[in-house]
Amino acid sequence: MTQTNFRSGPDANGLFGSFGGRYVAETLMPLVLDLNREYEAAKADPEFIKEMAYFQRDYIGRPNPLYFAERLTEFCGGAKIYFKREELNHTGAHKINNCIGQVLLAKRMGKKRLIAETGAGMHGVATATVAARFGLPCVIYMGATDIERQQANVFRMKLLGAEIVPVTSGTGTLKDAMNEALRDWVTNVDDTFYLIGTVAGPHPYPAMVRDFQSVIGKETKEQMQEKEGRLPDSLIACVGGGSNAMGLFHPFLDDASVEIIGVEAGGHGVDTDKHAASLNGGVPGVLHGNRTYLLQDNDGQITDAHSISAGLDYPGIGPEHAYLHEVKRVEYVSITDEEALDAFHQCCLLEGIIPALETAHALAEAMKRATNLRDDHLMVVCLSGRGDKDMQTVMNHMAAADNTQEKLV
């Protein structure tokens, strides 16, 4: 890793090295180019920046804490573990950071309708939330499989006034929901704003979502300086599409002393066909408007992803993550369903915090590493969301396990 500037991308064509770009239908290209112009103008507009700051502070509740996980640190017996508490945001996850930014852009562009895709439901809830706040109709595309395992979030979206469209094609998960949302966008391009929930899609979405989420890393930098007087030694975050991870990582990319680790969903193991680890088990290809690493078969067809976590159940990854993987600035590893569940239980019992199953993947990797590190090593884990939405999944898993009682005692 000889490069020192990792934060300059994307280029004018939306590329991070060979990844990213704009692979969209001809009817969408004018809108995508217009969105890029509007976003560049908004970034330079003091009024837009002021409005963003207002909603971050008074609506989302930022800054959220950087919390020393004392009992988890004692349990692991090594590195000093901090949690960046994104689950304390309004709506219970990092997703609202991006949704506020995009709805302000939609308003700026005169759009009258919002659409979004969702997997775990947290982006759907955040989109429905900002739609309600700004008085816009909202349609959420959600895979039928995900609707079954995320009933609480489906009800929350309906309470907030959103229309939920179940997607039964494919595996009925996030990939399929995104396909349907893109079809809607092509059909209703004039009045509709597509509020993409992760650092994927055609340019400018990967960079735009990253920028709206970078508040996570910026706050972490300031808070760690206040608490410890220096930068952290390592950062760990779960990666599906990768927006919470990119939000934490990006402000630190040019700080060579900071080790950065992204954690993919290993499912039943990367050596099986039931995982969602695009970087560790995929190859480059094009999906949903950008070139990135994807889970594909030998004919280039997208294969099914699997994870116990609905939010990581996606057969691709944001293009900037693909680039950071290739230039070796970020290390990407995978955690299995079982490892994530174990970490989920430990976090509940040791810290009194019920994390999302997505977050539990990052916690599992943090616990693995912390044990072998010095006690002056400062580690930050992005606590990307709370686990209320995952209660049924965890209950079902516990009920199916033969040794449930032994694990709980």
Curated annotation (Swiss-Prot):
Keywords: Amino-acid biosynthesis, Aromatic amino acid biosynthesis, Lyase, Pyridoxal phosphate, Tryptophan biosynthesis. It comes from the Bacteria. GO terms for cellular component: cytoplasm. Its EC number is 4.2.1.20. It catalyses: (1S,2R)-1-C-(indol-3-yl)glycerol 3-phosphate + L-serine = D-glyceraldehyde 3-phosphate + L-tryptophan + H2O. Pathway: Amino-acid biosynthesis; L-tryptophan biosynthesis; L-tryptophan from chorismate: step 5/5. CDD domains: Trp-synth_B. The keyword Amino-acid biosynthesis applies. One of its GO terms (molecular function) is tryptophan synthase activity. Its cofactor is pyridoxal 5'-phosphate. The modification N6-(pyridoxal phosphate)lysine is found at residue 95. The keyword Amino-acid biosynthesis applies. InterPro entries: Trp_synth_b_CS, Trp_synth_beta, Trp_synth_beta/beta-like, TrpB-like_PALP, TrpB-like_PALP_sf. Tetramer of two alpha and two beta chains. Belongs to the TrpB family. The beta subunit is responsible for the synthesis of L-tryptophan from indole and L-serine. This is Tryptophan synthase beta chain. It comes from Pseudomonas syringae pv. tomato (strain ATCC BAA-871 / DC3000). The gene is trpB.
